[in-house]
Design a protein with these regions (language model features):
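Short catalytic-loop micro-motif centered on adjacent basic/acidic residues
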Residues: 45-50, 76-79, 175
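N-terminal active-site wall of soluble small-molecule enzyme domains
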Residues: 52-80, 84-89
Length: 188
């Protein structure tokens, strides 16, 4: 049985960072914005924080996940995590989260120059983090950071990365073009 294609909206407004330069939400503001996004605007998913950033972020995530669990939205609350074996997963669990968006390197340039690792070494580290997350019942989506440059520079790197993740229990592989490198014609 085929399912119809569906566009799923994920809002990242609450994840303080480059997408919200100069903006920082208090824990109460974060929870209020999350309520509006999920209750009123009916956004499918929201990424509300980066793991391990601060106590303020922890407080904001705890407040938001507590509300979300009471209202049946907990599976729609997502937190950016890192390839750090257990540290991000433990932080997310402590904050009451159940979904991690794992930031991985989507270009050979980032993998070799930022991590100083080969793709195989990076995949080994990713699998270690994924295994720990799954053992703790955390659902994981994966971001391929800089994939658009990676695809333009060395498409096989991106294909090999996706192939290396396809049997690892990843719910979604996300391909954000945060730098605006690709045009719609190039990705559709």
């Amino acid at each position: 049985m085929e399912t119809e294609p569906r566009i799923i909206l994920m809002d990242t407004t609450l994840r303080d960072g480059e997408q919200t330069q100069g903006i920082s939400f208090t824990p109460a503001e974060k929870t209020n914005v999350a309520k509006a996004l999920l209750n009123k605007l009916r956004v499918d998913r929201i990424e509300i924080a980066s793991a391990r950033v601060s106590e303020g972020e922890m407080d904001g995530v705890m407040r938001t996940t507590s509300w979300a669990e009471d209202k049946g939205f907990l599976e729609q609350i997502e937190v950016l995590g890192f390839v750090d074996h257990n540290r991000s997963v433990d932080w997310i669990l402590e904050a009451g989260g159940r979904v991690m968006n794992l930031l991985t390197k989507g270009s050979e340039n980032h993998c070799t120059n930022q991590l100083r690792k080969t793709l195989d070494e990076h995949l080994k580290d990713i699998r270690k983090t994924l295994k720990y997350a799954h053992q703790n019942k955390v659902r994981v989506n994966v971001y391929l950071e800089d994939w658009s440059n990676g695809y333009r520079d060395l498409p096989d790197y991106v294909y090999d990365m996706v192939a290396g993740l396809k049997d690892e229990g990843v719910a979604r592989i996300m391909l954000p073009d945060t730098l605006g490198v690709m045009s719609p014609d190039q990705v559709y």
